[in-house]
A protein has these predicted regions:
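Metal-dependent polysaccharide deacetylase catalytic core of the NodB/CE4 family, i.e.
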Residues: 122-134, 170-173, 177-182, 190-297, ...
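Acidic/histidine-rich, surface-exposed loop or edge segments in extracytoplasmic proteins
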Residues: 56-58, 70-71, 127-137
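Primarily a LysM-type cell-wall glycan-binding module
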Residues: 49-83
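Short, solvent-exposed loop/turn elements at domain surfaces
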Residues: 73-74, 133-139, 192-194, 335-339
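Extracellular LysM carbohydrate-binding repeats and other cell-envelope/extracellular binding modules
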Residues: 30-56, 81-119
């Protein structure tokens, strides 16, 4: 009888194929797994605005219609708890005047810290004057008519004159400022500040800072008295320090030892501040360097004494990252025309921060 025998390896292959077919057949009969049921959708939280007679108050903003008697200041006081933020409402809505019936949006948070934006950053010009005259001008003397024209230019072109404290709060990230902010300063104790500049500043409602050096404060003549300084101090003129004698703080006299020089510096910045405090009953926090000069020793002494900041006469505007003890100031000379004045008012920079 004839027998056909498969090689052993073919026999194994045949058995493996048969087992695989049986296994696949068994898998095909299993039920497909069912997907897990999706969780039910969460209900959407509907935030209902608070509705008043003239406004809808949302978490991040207020939508309202201006009513008779409303002003930017009154709305800022009501919704932002600060009437000095009137400019913010005006700038956000891109309007200058407010009339009954106007629709307004008031954001309840101000995001642009330090004046930073996608396009660049805000800069604050600090302008400086020395003397004033009714009928003549020179490098350090501005004619009354020119000063009036410059202050009117600020008003008509949307600039906001801010106080020194507001400026430093901006540098410290404590508050925003209007886009076209400017600080006005005057150096020295000349009577023309009271006679000419002070009435013009009052006319436009502008604050200013007057830096005085105390050795020059003498009753009568061409300089200011403490009585006149006290009068101005009560009406938006912030009296601050220009040292005691107006000496250059960076230069040691040839006959001074270093100890004598250091003691003289302390008198210049500390004793003068104490005199102003005693005479006017006010805080002295800012100093203008005589001739605009400073060094590390002087700056360290100012910090130790308690000054918040100090000013040079370097031309240029000031971003939030400026050294607060080397603030730029642009001198306004008596030879300037209105275009020169305008060029000193740089309020924005599109330079890339690195």
């Amino acid at each position: 009888m004839f027998y056909f025998r498969l090689p052993f390896y073919l026999y194994c292959l045949f058995v493996f194929a048969a087992l695989l077919m049986v296994s696949c057949a068994g898998l095909s009969t299993r039920p497909e797994p069912q997907p897990f049921p999706s969780p039910p959708p969460e209900p959407q939280l509907q935030i209902q605005p608070e509705v008043t007679a003239d406004a809808r108050i949302f978490p991040d903003f207020v939508a309202l219609i201006a009513q008779p008697g409303d002003t930017f200041s009154s709305l800022a006081s009501k919704y932002l708890n600060d009437p000095s933020l009137d400019w913010f409402i005006a700038e956000f809505n891109e309007i200058t005047f407010l009339s009954p019936g106007q629709e307004l949006i008031i954001p309840l948070q101000i995001e642009e810290k330090g004046g930073l934006s996608l396009k660049g950053y805000q800069t604050i010009p600090v302008i400086s004057y020395h003397k004033f005259s009714k009928d003549k001008s020179d490098a350090l003397t501005v004619k009354e008519s020119a000063f009036e024209e410059q202050m009117r230019f600020l008003k008509e072109n949307g600039y906001r004159v801010i106080t020194m404290d507001q400026f430093f709060d901006f540098l410290d990230f404590k508050r925003p400022l209007p886009k076209k902010s400017v600080v006005i300063t005057i150096d020295d104790d000349w009577f023309s500040t009271y006679e000419i500049a002070f009435p013009v500043l009052k006319k436009y409602g502008y604050p200013a800072t007057l830096f005085v050096y105390t050795d020059l404060i003498i009753p009568g003549g061409k300089t200011l008295s403490w009585d006149l300084l006290a009068e101005m101090s009560k009406k938006n003129m912030d009296i601050q320090c220009h040292t005691k004698s107006h000496r250059n703080l960076t230069k040691r006299n040839s006959q001074e030892s270093f100890r004598e020089y250091f003691e003289a510096l302390k008198k210049e910045v500390a004793e003068s501040a104490e005199i102003i405090r005693r005479q006017l009953n006010k805080d002295v926090k800012y100093l203008a360097y005589p001739y605009g000069d400073a060094n590390h020793l002087v700056v360290s002494l100012l910090k130790k004494v308690g000054y918040r900041g100090a000013f040079t006469v370097e031309r240029g505007s000031n971003p939030f990252f400026i050294d607060p003890y080397r603030i730029n100031r642009s001198m306004i000379f008596g030879t300037f025309n209105l275009k020169d004045f305008e060029n000193s008012l740089v309020t924005f920079s599109d330079k890339e921060l690195r």
